[in-house]
Amino acid sequence: MTTHQTDHDGASSEGTVTVTEAGSGTYTQQINAGHHRIVADEPRPIGDDAGPTPYDLLLAALGACTSMTVRMYADRKGWPLRRVRVTLRHSRIHARDCADCETSVGFVDQIDRDIELTGDLDDTQRERLLYMADRCPVHQTLTSEVHITTSLR
């Protein structure tokens, strides 16, 4: 069993995220990622709305990774990309309403991602950046087989 250490001030080691009940509010969580601290919560009336929900954080991970990947590619190519904005929405839809889904019964999670590119880009550059958006590591993780192991201490 692998254990991950936190340093004396509660910060997680590189590549490890630690989530702990904050002690304030019913569902409020303190998230430590390296030396960064984030609060997560559920919206009212379930929680105290002290921070983004877990699904908000999932969308934020995909949006940030998408924007960073597009930016890195455009910079490497020397393309005139001034700004990237990614807007994401999560919903659960009936599987029968999803033409591209393998699942045919029950519900599936759907993420709608809208990418706005600002800059003097031609159509070929825009299409290539759209292609690269799907190559961001978080997108690759979410669309591939994921194996999660859980241990209890």
What role is predicted for each listed range?
Residues M1-A60, R71-R153:
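Extended beta-strand/beta-hairpin segments
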